[in-house]
Amino acid sequence: MKAVSLTKLDVSRGRMCAEVSIAQGTRDTTPALAARALAEFPSLASHACVNEKGATFGHVIDNTPLPHLMEHLVIAYQMRATLEKKQPPCAKVAGDVDGIPAPADDFTYLGTSEWIDESCGHARITVNFADDLVALRAFRDAESFLNSIVVL
């Protein structure tokens, strides 16, 4: 059984909306899960995020709904793909996104996540994109990554 399953993807101009199913017992992140996610994506902690505890995702990453983590992972995967197209990975310097130097003309990625029916584990995640194929891949990669780090 998978912790996270993409059940529907809709693409409209400049944004992609996914519906996901989250397995019972894995609906929220834990400090251990947050640590595994941050080990692969250190920049998650500094993502801007509207939440009740602070201005960044780092304030809530260890106790937030799993779809919220997936939203930020989709954005992180898009950022990585975009930056890798612009320049090859190299040594980490200030301003990097997980080891890839950020160019001056960054696209601003935005996203939202919400429960459609929390009791059934159904959620909606919406993100904007610069490239629809990159966003589609980002959703698939985020799903795969979460299923590799969530302990059922």
Give the label of every model feature segment:
Residues 1-41:
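N- or domain-start disorder-to-order transition segments that initiate the globular core
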